Amino acid sequence: MPTGDYDSKPSWADQVEEEGIDAEPLSPQIRKPDPVSFVLDTPREVINGNIKTITEYKLNDDDKTVKIVRTFKIETVKASKVVAQRKNWKKFGNSEYDPPGPNVATTTVSDDVLMTFITNKEDLNNQEEEDPMNKLKGQKIVSCRICKGDHWTTRCPYKDTLGPMQKELAEQLGLSTGDKEKAPGAEPEPAQAPVSKTGKYVPPSLRDGGSRRGESMQPNRRADDNATIRVTNLSEDTRETDLQELFRPFGSISRIYLAKDKTTGQSKGFAFISFHRREDAARAIAGVSGFGYDHLILNVEWAKPSTN
């Protein structure tokens, strides 16, 4: 049987295998990266007014070309010099070659968050109890001898006006009660009846001065009527202490009467204030009448003498 050499055409698979053996492997710099992050072209930026558009092309998982368009709105915000200098700092790491400003791929700018620190009320109460200075806040450490205010007597604003008046009043009261020496030429006091030493009860009508039946009270009452003023247009929240603080700078006060409602206990809007001296009452009328107090205009006038 004749034999001969026959030229056979190489198959396509053999050619591909031979090319794969002869070809050199691709370097890691040229090797195709992961299709998810592979960028076909550099991003293109287009700025139109305050609108910035970035367009780029990538390959997805199916090895298909995808076009990504991102649109940004440019806003101009005034910042302090320190913030502006901090934005010009040189970047490092993976963001070394990024342009100025935050990179949306690595940086997320969120809204400002306002923080409110809430403390426990029990802790505050414990601190107030432990602090000795807080206990002294409600106490009156310093008291003025002239106006009874919370300041030193040497710094009293009424020292020049009330000081001499109080001294003169103290001298008058001392002479009337016999605390000081009697003035020359004064009438001698009547001799008092001897006090019973048996320890028995003596009715007031049989005591010394019992027959006069209050004659000694008449001059004092007339003096109070002459130095009594009437204050009207008071608020419902007014108290005797408020009137004491309001009229005390004008002179020594002997009596304060504030008309109150029997059921509610609130002020009826008027009060009577009696001074020891008529001059002090006149000065109080001139100083307080027309004065704004507790959102009301006070009216001060002389009180009409009682008929009884």
From Swiss-Prot:
Name the UniProt record assigns to this protein? Eukaryotic translation initiation factor 3 subunit G-A
Disordered: region residues: 1-35, 177-226
Q: Where is the RRM domain?
A: 227-305
Sequence ranges of Basic and acidic residues compositional bias: 209-226
Superkingdom in the source lineage: Eukaryota
rRNA-binding recorded as keyword:
no
Keyword Kinase listed? The answer is: no
Where is composition skewed (Low complexity) in this entry? 185-194
Q: What is its main location?
A: cytoplasm
The family classification in the record reads:
Belongs to the eIF-3 subunit G family.
Could you tell me what this protein does?
RNA-binding component of the eukaryotic translation initiation factor 3 (eIF-3) complex, which is involved in protein synthesis of a specialized repertoire of mRNAs and, together with other initiation factors, stimulates binding of mRNA and methionyl-tRNAi to the 40S ribosome. The eIF-3 complex specifically targets and initiates translation of a subset of mRNAs involved in cell proliferation. This subunit can bind 18S rRNA.
Quaternary context: Component of the eukaryotic translation initiation factor 3 (eIF-3) complex, which is composed of 13 subunits: eif3a, eif3b, eif3c, eif3d, eif3e, eif3f, eif3g, eif3h, eif3i, eif3j, eif3k, eif3l and eif3m.
Any Pfam family hit: RRM_1
Molecular function GO labels: RNA binding; translation initiation factor activity
Q: Name one GO cellular component term.
A: eukaryotic translation initiation factor 3 complex
Write down the InterPro entries for this protein, in alphabetical order: eIF3_g, eIF3g_N, eIF3G_RRM, Nucleotide-bd_a/b_plait_sf, RBD_domain_sf, RRM_dom
Q: Which SMART domains does the protein's record reference? A: RRM
Coiled-coil portions? none
Recorded name of the encoding gene: eif3g-a
Q: Where in the cell is it found?
A: Cytoplasm
